[in-house]
């Protein structure tokens, strides 16, 4: 039984960080002929099958492919085409979604590494290994979730709070920008996003920051992809100042920040937590070109302790901790907030709001079509929000036994909380408050691992988990570089027969159409295809395929280590390929209490696997 009340020390997360940044070019003559990636290529990523150019497999992040050469009738013949090992002792969690461009796979790995591989053979073309300092502060393993590509460059973030642009053909550094102090806990784990501002016509590189568990102020950035120069920065704590073209622009929300308590004895006039209030947008953004809006999740407030963000003797419901634990619509021209919807006001449970925002056409019960976002939150509720204005359209639970709220009020958009679910402060003379049993726990009904949406079935395929936690308050004060939580916890089982639950959800009725249970937590993303298939990976190392309509398991392959990444698919030379990054790690083994014990037997790893139908059997591959 394991109890953790703070992130694992940085030194425990890495065998060695004395590595040189380098690029090894192998076969650069052929790579030099590769075409540049245009905005039109990226805008049509979800419709074209030869490349995968965006995190989410398109600007709408649906993770749906029109490919159907591999289908429910022949997937049982799916066979490994090749695998590539990331090598050396640097394993840990491998959460990367690969991208594919012009026959080259770009896949990031733990410890801020990036590999370019021949998509057909797995031959390494080049490697970039970022030099990391000893004092990085990753909360949840040394992961990286992917890269972006545009023009002749590939971009990714690093654990020392930097963004790097590499020549996509050679791996050589084009530019490198530091955006924050890694010693204070800032990192970058999410894949950047490429968007085109509909007003100015400029193509922008959008990225966020990580570090809410260390008391950072979350920030979203826009950069010139050619030079790396910052165009704007938007903080996600109310009352903090943004930047535009290198100068102060506007504060986020109300300059007086009424959603955070005042403190007349503080130099800022606000409580300590306001200066370290979190809200980090550490996942990748989606982009709605029709309304010219960047849509991204905002992280949990800092600290986790609700009473540190509530006036003494006050009610947490009077202090929402804006703009945290919600989804934000941002103007790409200026970085101004266009709209905000908060999933968990004054979030007391580290539910965050960073899970992906999937853009889709929502057909309401009255037949009206709404251009919407879909979001399965860590708090256990599934949200459908009008992406033109941030107004709630529908909300329902997607996991069992939610304790903290009974439902979401569709008129007010706010949760209806249950009494006693905000853990109380310690009694006088006590270090810890009374523990409360909460579900979902802070790791969520679903965490960062992205769901998929099928344009054929109209269903969302959600990689959920059933678990709970004992949760209690502790004393908290800010120290640079130290965990800023004010809470203790122990995660526990909910059911004896499973933790993971892959669920097909109807976004209109809120009903579970089918469910597949897994013994271990699900931490991999999901892919849906026109072949009536759904793919995901499991904690015990299986890459699996399911019938999208019935949920029947049709195929599986043991990769040798747990899978905690989103799969992809593409077409090359008339053949459909599927790829997935393999290597167990991430937050569960570090923070997961009883769940960490459950997953301890899983071997670590670091590799990329590619599958296809046997070439000799493409014409006859059917039952």
Curated annotation (Swiss-Prot):
Induction (UniProt): Induced by growth on ethanol.
Description of activity control: Inhibited by cyclopropanone ethylhemiketal. Activated by ammonia (500mM), methylamine (5mM), ethylamine (5mM), octylamine (5mM), ethanolamine (5mM) and 1-amino-2-propanol (5mM), in assays using artificial electron acceptors. Ammonia is not needed for, nor does it stimulate, the ethanol-oxidizing activity when using the natural electron acceptor cytochrome c550.
Amino acids binding Ca(2+) 1: 45, 48, 51
Protein location: Periplasm
Chain intervals for the UniProt region annotation (Disordered): 244-281, 413-434
Keyword Metal-binding: yes
This protein's UniProt keywords: Calcium, Disulfide bond, Metal-binding, Oxidoreductase, Periplasm, PQQ, Signal
GO biological process, one term: ethanol catabolic process
Residues the entry annotates as binding Ca(2+) 2: 213, 300, 350
Signal sequence region: 1-34
pH effect summary: Optimum pH is 9 in assays using artificial electron acceptors. However, in a system with homogenous QEDH, cytochrome c550 and a membrane fraction of P.aeruginosa, electron transport from ethanol to O(2) is observed at the more physiological conditions of pH 7, and the system is inactive at pH 9.
PTM characteristics: The disulfide ring formed between the two adjacent cysteine residues Cys-139 and Cys-140 is essential for efficient electron transfer at pH 7 from QEDH to its natural electron acceptor cytochrome c550.
Pathway recorded for this protein: Alcohol metabolism; ethanol degradation; acetate from ethanol: step 1/2
SS bond partners: 139-140
Entry superkingdom: Bacteria
Coiled coil: none
Subunit structure: Homodimer. Interacts with cytochrome c550.
Function: Catalyzes the oxidation of ethanol and other primary alcohols to the corresponding aldehydes, except methanol, which is a very poor substrate. Uses a specific inducible cytochrome c550, encoded by the adjacent gene in the locus, as electron acceptor. Is a key enzyme of the carbon and energy metabolism during growth of P.aeruginosa on ethanol as the sole carbon and energy source. Is also able to use secondary alcohols as well as aminoalcohols like ethanolamine and 1-amino-2-propanol, and aldehydes as substrates.
Name of this chain's protein: Quinoprotein ethanol dehydrogenase
Source species taxonomy: Bacteria, Pseudomonadati, Pseudomonadota, Gammaproteobacteria, Pseudomonadales
């Amino acid at each position: 039984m394991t109890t953790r009340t703070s992130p694992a020390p940085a030194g425990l997360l890495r065998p060695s960080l004395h590595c040189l940044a380098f690029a090894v070019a192998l076969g650069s003559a052929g790579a030099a002929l590769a075409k540049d990636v245009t905005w039109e290529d990226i805008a049509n990523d979800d419709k074209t099958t030869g490349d995968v150019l965006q995190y989410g497999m398109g600007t709408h992040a649906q993770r749906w492919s029109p490919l159907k050469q591999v289908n429910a009738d022949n997937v049982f013949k799916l066979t490994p085409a090749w695998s590539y090992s990331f090598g050396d002792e640097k394993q840990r969690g491998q959460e990367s979604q690969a991208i594919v461009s012009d026959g080259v796979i770009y896949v990031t790995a733990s410890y801020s590494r990036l590999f370019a591989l021949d998509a057909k053979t797995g031959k390494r073309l080049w490697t970039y290994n970022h030099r990391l300092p000893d004092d990085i502060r990753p909360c949840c393993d040394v992961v990286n979730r992917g890269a972006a590509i545009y023009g002749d460059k590939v971009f990714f973030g690093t654990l020392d709070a930097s963004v790097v642009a590499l020549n996509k053909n050679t791996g050589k550094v084009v530019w490198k920008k530091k955006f924050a102090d890694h010693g204070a806990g800032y990192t970058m784990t999410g894949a950047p996003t490429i968007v085109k501002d509909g007003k100015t016509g400029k193509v922008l590189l959008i990225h966020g920051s990580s570090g809410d568990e260390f008391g950072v102020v979350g920030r979203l950035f826009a950069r010139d992809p050619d030079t790396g120069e910052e165009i704007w920065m938007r903080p996600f704590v109310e009352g903090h100042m943004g930047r535009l073209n290198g100068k102060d622009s506007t504060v986020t929300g109300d300059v007086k920040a009424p959603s955070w308590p005042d403190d007349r004895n503080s130099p800022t006039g606000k409580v300590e937590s306001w200066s370290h209030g979190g809200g980090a947008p550490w996942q990748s953004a989606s982009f709605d070109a029709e309304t010219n809006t960047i849509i991204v999740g905002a992280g949990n407030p800092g600290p986790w302790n609700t009473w540190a963000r509530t006036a003494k003797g006050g009610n947490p419901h009077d202090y929402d901790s804006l703009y945290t634990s919600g989804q934000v619509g941002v103007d790409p021209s200026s970085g101004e907030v266009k709209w905000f919807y908060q999933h968990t006001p004054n979030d007391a449970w580290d539910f965050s709001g960073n899970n992906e925002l999937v853009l889709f056409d929502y057909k309401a019960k009255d037949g009206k079509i709404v251009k919407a976002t879909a979001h399965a939150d860590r708090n256990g509720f599934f949200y459908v929000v009008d992406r033109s204005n941030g107004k709630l359209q529908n909300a329902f639970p997607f996991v069992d036994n939610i304790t903290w709220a009974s439902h979401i009020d569709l008129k007010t958009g706010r949760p209806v909380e249950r009494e006693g679910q905000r853990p109380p402060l310690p009694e006088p003379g006590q270090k810890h408050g009374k523990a409360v049993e909460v579900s979902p726990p802070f790791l969520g009904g679903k965490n960062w691992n992205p769901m998929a949406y099928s344009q054929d079935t109209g269903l969302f395929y959600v990689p959920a988990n059933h678990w709970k936690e004992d949760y209690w308050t502790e004393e908290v004060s800010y120290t640079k570089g130290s965990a800023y939580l004010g809470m203790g916890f122990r995660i526990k089982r909910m059911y004896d027969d499973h933790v993971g639950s892959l669920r097909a959800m109807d976004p209109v009725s809120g009903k579970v159409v089918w469910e597949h249970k897994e013994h271990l937590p699900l931490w991999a993303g999901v892919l849906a295809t026109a072949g009536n298939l759904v793919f995901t990976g499991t904690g015990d190392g299986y890459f699996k395929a399911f019938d999208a309509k019935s949920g029947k398991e049709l195929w599986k392959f043991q990769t040798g280590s747990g899978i905690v990444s989103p799969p992809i698919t593409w077409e090359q030379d008339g053949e459909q390929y599927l790829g997935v990054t393999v290597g167990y790690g991430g937050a569960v083994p570090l923070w997961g209490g009883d769940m960490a014990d459950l997953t301890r037997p899983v071997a670590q790893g670091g590799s990329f696997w590619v599958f296809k139908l046997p070439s000799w059997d493409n014409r006859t591959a059917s039952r």
